[in-house]
Regions:
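Juxtamembrane "helix exit" motif at the C-terminal ends of alpha-helical transmembrane segments
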Residues: 60-70, 104-109, 220, 291-300, ...
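N-terminal amphipathic/basic-hydrophobic helices that include classical n-h-c signal peptides
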Residues: 1-24
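Transmembrane helix-loop-helix hairpins in multi-pass inner-membrane proteins
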Residues: 129-185, 293, 298-330, 335
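Selected transmembrane alpha-helices and immediately adjacent juxtamembrane segments
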Residues: 21-80, 154-159, 163-237, 314, ...
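Hydrophobic faces of alpha-helical transmembrane segments in multi-pass integral membrane proteins
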Residues: 52, 56, 60, 69, ...
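Alpha-helical membrane-embedding segments
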Residues: 103-125, 151-163, 182-185, 212-219, ...
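Alpha-helical membrane segments and immediately flanking helix-loop junctions
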Residues: 87-144, 239-298
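Hydrophobic alpha-helical transmembrane segments
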Residues: 60-72, 91-105, 145-153, 196, ...
Length: 336
């Protein structure tokens, strides 16, 4: 065979391979674009809903702060915090975190003179039950019971605080029963600060929700979700969670319950998770989520990260397996 003929064959093969590659790339981009189009309507709906909830809650919290109502509430319950080995001033940190978010609690904790023991206890309590109003609204949207979520998170926080006070070495922190007076800015300044912060939050929320929903859809489209599920399969069995909830569990632990809930809504909307599996996941992530940024911030304040993380994970495991037992008994004895 002549050299020129071989060159022609090789050239034809290169053209054929190039054509096949182009077709594959064209097909890949088509699948990506279709996946993005599919998530846009649901993402917009979720963003609008979460935006309304966020504006209402943050505005209400701004008023509570402006009129110094949160310090009054914390002063009222501060004696109870002796049960957790905490000074009364930490009540403001817990109440702020409970109704607002972790950052509010962290701001208060940073002003207090607390040792590692006290920071570990209050951090565990805050991470169990922060952003109660917003995150309960998100979980309710997934089908969870509001009463169950509030009781689970609140009682878990109180129990773990009491438990850690009993088992951690060292002495309870010295009692400080008064909370520092809050400086109040003019309402116009307070309102402008709230408006700017809320607008920034809404933009960030929209970007993150779109990005997560697109990522989740692409992972499903290209079969990567199955790999993630197989990788986390042993861990999901330990937690008592369905294997196909691996990605949602991962999202909730990395970016938090609010954004994780947005992805859950997208998943539930497509019927990917049965109701009971959703309830089990809700129970777990309600008290153990945001285990990257929030946990790191609490550690920076002096908390012991592995204690804060492990006690919440253990509590989540107990609660989920207890809920599985409840489902088993309901099915066996036809309980309603």
């Amino acid at each position: 065979m002549s050299a020129s003929r071989l060159d022609m064959i090789f050239f034809a093969l290169r053209l054929d391979n190039s054509y096949i590659w182009d077709r594959r790339m064209e097909n890949t981009w088509h699948r990506i674009s279709e996946s993005i189009k599919e998530v846009v309507p649901g993402s917009v709906k979720t963003i609008v809903w979460m935006g309304k909830i966020t504006v209402l809650i943050t505005f209400a919290m701004m008023l509570l702060k402006f009129f110094n109502i949160l310090p009054v509430i914390s002063d009222f319950i501060s004696p109870v915090f002796k049960l957790f080995g905490l000074p009364g001033a930490t009540a403001l940190a817990y109440i702020s975190g409970y109704f607002v978010n972790c950052y509010s609690a962290i701001a208060v904790i940073s002003t207090l003179d607390l040792d590692w023991r006290a920071v570990t206890i209050i951090a565990t309590m805050v991470l169990c039950s922060h952003s109660m109003v917003l995150e309960t609204a998100v979980l309710k949207k997934t089908g969870a019971s509001v009463v169950r979520v509030v009781l689970t998170r609140t009682l878990s926080a109180l129990f773990l605080g009491f438990f850690l006070n009993k088992v951690l070495p060292g002495s309870p922190a010295a009692s400080k029963d008064t909370v520092a007076q809050q400086w109040t800015l003019p309402f116009s300044k307070t309102f402008c600060d709230w408006l700017i912060a809320t607008l920034k939050l809404l933009v960030l929320m929209a970007v993150i929700i779109f990005a997560l929903n697109i990522l989740q859809r692409l992972l499903c489209e290209f079969g990567i979700m199955d790999l993630i599920s197989r990788f986390f399969k042993p861990l999901m069995y330990l937690f008592g969670l369905p294997v196909n909830a691996s990605f949602l569990w991962l999202v909730a632990n990395i970016v938090g319950l609010g954004y994780g809930g947005a992805v859950m809504l997208e998943e539930i909307g497509r019927g990917e998770l049965p109701d009971r599996d959703v309830q089990l996941l809700d129970t777990h992530i309600s008290i153990s989520h945001s285990n990257v940024e929030d946990l790191s911030l609490m550690t920076a304040l002096g908390g012991v990260w592995w204690i804060i993380l492990s006690v919440r994970l253990c509590a989540a495991i107990v609660l989920v397996w207890g809920q599985r037992l409840e489902y088993f008994l309901r099915d066996k004895y036809n309980w309603q």
